[in-house]
């Protein structure tokens, strides 16, 4: 028999026991009283906090929204058919978060950040970003001074958007709202190719799965998925998933913003998010207000949109930002931005309804799309008269500001005079000129979907249009004139375009533009 050495045995036992935990593991557990329609009432979680994540049997996550005397009301984030009365629920003692990292770019994820595009798990380092977070304080922000080029002539010239701005896209259904937002995303490819990417997040809230698949296909076709994350909460997802989807999009955008990079988030659309929130609130028996929306529906959108900001350039100030997630400490950089393009759908052009007026008052301007313009072939169907950008003017490049300064006013005047012109033909010469030039400007501002125009080409085209070098061109030939004019500039005057891009516009540049315009106009004159 082998010699058994007691000291060795006791040493092994000591080593084994040193790794075992002897303290009692305390878990707060509650019981489901009632479940249905994506909402559960739970008894026993007396210490639960508002906004806290809960874990149900089978790993399903929930979130506490209502704290009542004898129970808590929670929303269920996912498929809840396995949850029954009497099921146990555990507190997690953390607020709802989503894991974000560089590996998320190019992927389609759900509200909880899980990939749903069949391309496997998200790789690389991931950081915990809270879904709900306080917006950066005034000290940590800086004014909007840098343009966010959309590639859409009508927007970049007359309703410019700056990095860190919130610009609402509003209009009836089928007026091209999503197309405007996708154009803005596709136009960022120029910056991606240059090595200065603007990371884009497209949040699809309550849309058909087939529509979302089409949008992802469009982005892939134009090479835009290389710098885009799609957050999808389809119409078939439970209301809580649709309600939280924009918050997930904001959390993803904040990761890029707080690490010193520009990001653009599109919320498509917030009307459906408000409807989902109304559903959740009514199921939780919160008192209804106007149009049966809960009283805090304004706060729902304001706290979401306030998270868009241009962060102070100083790394030191940015690192001291309020409500910074623990996971980001040490990698925070200044100078980042998050631009928001929320979309709102109106009913029969009624911008004075509850949700549209709320979001108009929160944002820094709106782009109003009109069904009549859309049907008459003006696309993008932007009504210039009631579309505004409250801060973007400071962000325009100098050359664009100089050239497009009067364009908005001219077009508003043209619309007014055109309405009068229908009643009588005896118009004086200056009125006729305004109408004729307005028609040509209108043609110049038309643009097919998914074909963004670079800023220097926009400046060149708008210069010749507003200064009357196209007055001799037949209206229906304006688009052909534009195509030829830009081709000549691209082939023979690359330096001029480069100077315009840098913001410069002087007599030498305008002489080149005049000369080329006159040469090309001969071909398309009456």
From Swiss-Prot:
GO terms for molecular function: ADP binding; ATP binding; proton-transporting ATP synthase activity, rotational mechanism. It catalyses: ATP + H2O + 4 H(+)(in) = ADP + phosphate + 5 H(+)(out). It is a peripheral membrane protein. The record marks 387 as: Required for activity. Transmembrane segments: none annotated. It is found in: Cell inner membrane. Belongs to the ATPase alpha/beta chains family. This is ATP synthase subunit alpha. It comes from Cytophaga hutchinsonii (strain ATCC 33406 / DSM 1761 / CIP 103989 / NBRC 15051 / NCIMB 9469 / D465). The lineage of its organism: Bacteria, Pseudomonadati, Bacteroidota, Cytophagia, Cytophagales.
């Amino acid at each position: 028999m082998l010699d058994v050495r007691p000291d060795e045995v006791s040493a092994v036992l000591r080593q084994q026991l040193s790794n075992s935990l002897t303290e009692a593991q305390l878990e707060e557990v509650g019981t489901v009283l009632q479940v249905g329609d994506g909402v559960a009432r739970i008894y026993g979680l007396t210490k639960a906090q508002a906004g806290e994540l809960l874990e149900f049997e089978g790993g399903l996550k929930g979130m506490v929204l209502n704290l009542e005397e004898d129970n808590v009301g929670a929303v269920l984030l996912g498929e809840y058919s396995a949850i029954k009365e009497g099921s146990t629920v555990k507190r997690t003692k953390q607020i709802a978060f989503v894991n974000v990292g560089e590996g998320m770019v190019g992927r389609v994820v759900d509200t909880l950040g899980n990939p749903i595009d069949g391309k496997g798990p998200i790789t690389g380092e991931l950081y915990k970003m809270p879904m709900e977070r306080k917006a950066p304080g005034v000290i940590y922000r800086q004014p909007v001074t840098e343009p966010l080029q959309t590639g859409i002539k009508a927007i970049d010239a007359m309703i410019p958007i700056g990095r860190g701005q919130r610009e609402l896209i509003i209009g009836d259904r089928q007026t091209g709202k999503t197309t405007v937002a996708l154009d803005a995303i596709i136009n960022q490819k120029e910056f991606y190719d240059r090595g200065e990417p603007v990371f884009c997040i497209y949040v699809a809230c309550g849309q058909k799965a087939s529509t979302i698949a089409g949008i992802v296909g469009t982005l892939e076709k134009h090479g835009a998925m290389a710098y885009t994350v799609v957050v999808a909460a389809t119409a078939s997802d439970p209301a809580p998933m649709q309600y939280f989807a924009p918050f997930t999009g904001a959390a993803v955008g904040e990761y890029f913003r707080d690490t010193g990079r520009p990001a653009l988030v599109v919320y498509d659309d917030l009307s459906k998010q408000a409807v989902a929130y109304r559903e959740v609130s009514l199921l939780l028996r919160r008192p209804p207000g106007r149009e049966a929306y809960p009283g805090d529906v304004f706060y729902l959108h304001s706290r979401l949109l306030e998270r868009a900001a241009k962060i102070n350039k100083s790394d030191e100030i940015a690192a001291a930002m309020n409500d910074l997630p623990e996971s980001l400490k040490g990698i925070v950089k200044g100078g980042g931005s998050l631009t928001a393009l929320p979309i709102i759908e109106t009913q029969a052009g009624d911008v004075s309804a509850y949700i549209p007026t709320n979001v108009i008052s929160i944002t820094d301007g709106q782009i109003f799309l009109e069904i009549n313009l859309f049907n008459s072939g003006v696309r993008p169907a932007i009504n210039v008269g009631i579309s505004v950008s409250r801060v973007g003017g400071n962000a325009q490049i100098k050359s664009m500001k100089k050239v497009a300064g009067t364009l908005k006013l001219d077009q508003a005047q043209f619309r007014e005079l055109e309405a009068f012109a229908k009643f009588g033909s005896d118009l004086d010469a200056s009125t006729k000129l305004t109408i004729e030039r307005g028609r040509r400007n209108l043609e110049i501002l038309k643009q097919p979907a998914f074909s963004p125009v670079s800023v220097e080409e926009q400046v060149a085209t708008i210069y010749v249009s507003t200064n009357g070098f196209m007055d001799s061109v037949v209206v229906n030939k304006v688009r052909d004139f534009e195509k030829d004019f830009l081709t000549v500039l691209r082939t023979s005057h690359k330096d001029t375009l480069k100077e315009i891009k840098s913001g410069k516009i002087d007599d030498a540049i305008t002489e080149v533009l005049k000369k080329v315009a006159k040469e090309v106009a001969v071909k398309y004159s009456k």
